[in-house]
A protein has these predicted regions:
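Terminal hydrophobic membrane-targeting helix
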Residues: 12-83
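Outer-membrane beta-barrel transmembrane domain signature of Gram-negative proteins
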Residues: 214-216
Length: 393
């Protein structure tokens, strides 16, 4: 009965109080380091936490902005708890707080940077009579983040990124919750991805992308089991392509101009090098859907046929190949890119089908091998590398 009476007497009576000068000065000085003005408010009261204790709340608002952080806490001689929350807050590059931070930490490698989205934060920790070590959890929620920028004259854009990183632990042991990342669209270095999503597992020492998928060239691109060591980002991975549009895919091959129809499948091997600062294409293999007929109409086949002169083809033979590629119905289309020594590579194109010359149909069984530097054969633009390095190659 005595304990109950004490509990009733010590039930929280929250009263606004002045923030202690030491705490207020610390909050204001930390905000001032970022060029911001903070307005702290506090309330205190009493509570019963396996014994008499103190409870209260602290709220810090950034002046002339929607940014707000609030904390609730309670403690006694036996146990304590604390919770921090930042309500969902919309932001953009024109937000006063964001603008101040960008002025302090400018992004020099890009221009025309615009972005928007919303973010929320929650965290809590406690130590009770039954759990003598602190138990904690934290969650950051990012919604509908979109950004666009220019890097070395090339546009990059990301729209609709949503992800919720979360972690929990006991004392200093950390368990990071698996994340599911979604992005509505990505445009970078001439490549467009739609409906990107990825499952990611993060530990204190590594990142594992268990699966990722996106719409690409009217089809699908998939990635499986990409392991990243943050201290050494040199790694390789394979992209699997399924049911992509042949016409869209061939626009990324230098020398291709014209129209194509049909669906392609295959895989592309890529490497992260120089600590993740550059992406290098290794090998690639694409093939048409077996049993289906596609169309190939090259408006300028000369870039693909000029290399035949080095293989001993005379002008008439090269002209016949060029004529065939201007109006071709193919049953087999294969592209095989093989990286050689240094920057050299070979692009092998195999086409089987029927070419139309006026009213005459001619069977075609052709393999073209084009040698050159890899970046000349495939129009990757190395834009991702240039963005990270901040320079043009």
């Amino acid at each position: 009965m005595i304990g109950l009476a004490v509990a009733v007497l010590l039930v929280i009576i929250a009263l606004p109080v002045a923030v202690p000068p030491i705490a207020e000065n610390l909050i204001r000085s930390k905000a001032a380091e970022f060029g911001l003005s903070a307005v702290p408010q506090m309330s205190l009261g009493y509570c019963w936490r396996n014994g008499p204790g103190i409870a209260g709340s602290l709220q810090v608002k950034i002046k002339d902005s929607p940014w707000l952080v609030a904390a609730d806490f309670g403690a006694s001689c036996s146990e304590w708890s604390a919770a921090v929350r930042m309500p969902e807050t919309a932001f953009s590059e024109s937000d006063p707080v964001v603008r101040t931070l960008l002025a302090k930490y400018p992004v020099t490698a890009v221009s025309n940077l615009t972005f928007s989205g919303s973010v929320a934060l929650s965290a809590k920790a406690e130590r009770t009579f039954h759990t003598p070590v602190p138990v904690w959890s934290a969650k950051l929620q990012v919604k509908d983040f979109s950004a666009s920028l220019m890097a070395k004259g090339k546009p990059y854009a990301l729209a609709g990124l949503s992800v919720t990183p979360a972690a929990r632990g006991i004392a200093d042991r950390v368990d990071i919750t698996p994340m599911f990342l979604r992005v509505k669209s990505i445009s970078a270095a001439g490549f467009d991805l739609e409906g990107f999503h990825a499952s990611v597992r993060v530990s204190e020492k590594s990142v594992l992308v268990t699966e990722a998928s996106a719409g690409f060239c009217g089809g699908q691109v998939n990635l499986y089991s990409l392991f990243l060591d943050p201290k050494n980002l040199n790694t390789g991975f394979t992209l699997f392509l399924d049911d992509i549009n042949a016409g869209e895919a061939l626009t990324h091959v230098n020398g291709f101009s014209g129209e194509a129809s049909g669906r392609l499948h295959g895989k592309i091997k890529l490497f992260l090098r120089e600590g993740g600062e550059s992406v290098r294409l290794s090998d690639a293999f694409l093939y048409s859907t077996p049993g289906e007929v596609g169309k190939l109409r090259l408006s300028n086949p000369e870039p693909l046929t000029d290399n035949l002169a080095l293989a001993g083809f005379d002008d008439d033979a090269r002209a016949n190949v060029a004529n065939a590629l201007t109006d071709l119905d193919y049953s087999v289309l294969r592209l095989n890119l093989r990286r050689g020594e240094g920057k050299s590579a070979t692009l092998s194109t195999t086409v089987r089908g029927t070419a139309t010359r006026g009213e005459v149909s001619v069977p075609v069984d052709l393999t073209l091998n084009v040698n050159g530097e890899l970046e000349q054969l495939v129009n990757t633009s190395l834009g991702y590398s240039n963005l990270l390095k901040g320079k043009q190659k």
